[in-house]
Amino acid sequence: SEVNCLTYKEILVLGKNSPALRPTMYDFLVYRSIDILNTISRYNKQEPITNKQLLFAPVKEFVQMPIEVKKMDAYSNTLKLYQSLLQSEIAAERTDAILISDLDRLEYANNIIGLSQNDSLYIQSLEQLSQQYSKNPYKVEILYKLAQYYYQGNYISSNRDPQKALDICNNGIRQFPKYFRIDVLKQLAKEITQTTVSYSINPNVYPGHKQEVNLSFKNLSEISISLYKITESTLEYLNLNKRVPKLEKISTHTYRLPKRLDSQDTILRLPVPNTGRYQLTVSYANNSKADSSYFSSSRLSTIA
């Protein structure tokens, strides 16, 4: 298990971080086996996990716990592999490799149990590790898992907290700016703060009624929606190809929105005065090009 992975670099596909995070050939083989078991688990019913709390025990307790390996049971076999891997890393005193493998073990345990009441065990384990490695640059790996958890949340419980995730990222970036994988926190922080906008409109609106813009947005404080009437004849319009149609501006509405890091939904309504073909244009800060959609207004719009 002590054979350095670089000994086989000619036949392995090595990532930039492989020598640091997977330092021996044994590490590579264990993780390859875990990948195979994960594939098997998708196609075979797995035995339920009974001793859930021990799965989140500190690493020195986890490596001592008895794990009954069952034939064709991916869960027990994977946990046993993590246990064997951690035992070898503890024996070799590879502190950094122990942390990485332990983080993977905790995430795996949380995933296979998959119940919201176990989230506290997972978070508690990560926070304990964060304290243990408080001065070690590898703490960034722990912070990344914590930030991911709070950013992505759990579909069962309401534990999603993008602001907390962002704070964790920023604290890690300030504390360990030169860590070789600090970009994982920078990239996640960028994703959390990124402005996202999507919308849909009705293809037909009755004249005198309002077009409803179903808007989903994140990290956005203001949006402008402009309405234009296409003034060309039907024949001219159909033969436009890629040419921009002749437009008559009808209105522009600017809406103030609650700027938050989590996604929100709302409906914005614009009056449509007369029959005709319309272009609706959406613009907001930092959007390099306004987005346009088209719809029609006719007295037949409400007929199914």
Role assignments for model-derived ranges:
Residues 1-304:
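N-terminal, cleavable Sec-dependent signal peptides of secreted/periplasmic/extracellular proteins
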